[in-house]
């Protein structure tokens, strides 16, 4: 494991294959028809892997729309059925996650990010 922080914290191979994580964050987002976004800023340390899952008994809708912030801008929408959770995103350096879904009642999605 690395003894320092920042871009040079890991060996070249660890940094290249993206398989080493320095830390992780977990955040619950409540979806009720409006967009919910991760509150913590990941710009200085983007997530190498993001996992979305729903705690038991919290989902009653059909789909969720995911929007990822990569390189300072949000990209296209990704639509995922709740039946497909947990959902893992790898291979991108994600700075933030925005989720839309729900139709009045509160649906809770947990965003687990590895940095």
Where do the PLM segments sit?
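Short loop/turn segments at connectors of secondary-structure elements within structured domains
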Residues: 4-8, 46, 60-62, 104-108
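Noncatalytic modules at the cell exterior or secretory-pathway interfaces
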Residues: 48-50, 89-107
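Beta-strand repeat scaffolds of extracellular/surface proteins
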Residues: 34, 55-57, 71-73, 97, ...
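Short, intrinsically disordered N-terminal pre-domain segments
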Residues: 1-23, 113-115
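Surface-exposed ligand/attachment interfaces on beta-rich extracellular proteins
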Residues: 15-21, 25-45, 58-60, 104
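Short, surface-exposed beta-strand/strand-loop-strand elements in extracellular ectodomains
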Residues: 53-76, 109-114
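Beta-sandwich interaction modules
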Residues: 40-42, 77-95, 113-114
């Amino acid at each position: 494991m690395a003894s320092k922080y920042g871009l040079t914290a890991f060996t070249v191979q660890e940094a290249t294959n993206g398989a080493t994580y320095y830390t992780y964050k977990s955040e619950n987002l409540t979806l009720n028809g409006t967009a919910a976004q991760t509150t913590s800023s990941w710009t200085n340390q983007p997530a190498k892997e993001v996992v979305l899952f729903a705690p038991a008994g919290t989902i009653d809708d059909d789909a969720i729309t995911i929007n990822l912030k990569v390189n300072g801008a949000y990209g296209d929408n990704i639509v995922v059925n709740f039946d497909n959770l947990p959902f893992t995103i790898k291979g991108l350096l994600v700075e933030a996650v925005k989720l839309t879904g729900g139709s009045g009642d509160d649906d809770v999605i947990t965003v687990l990010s590895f940095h």
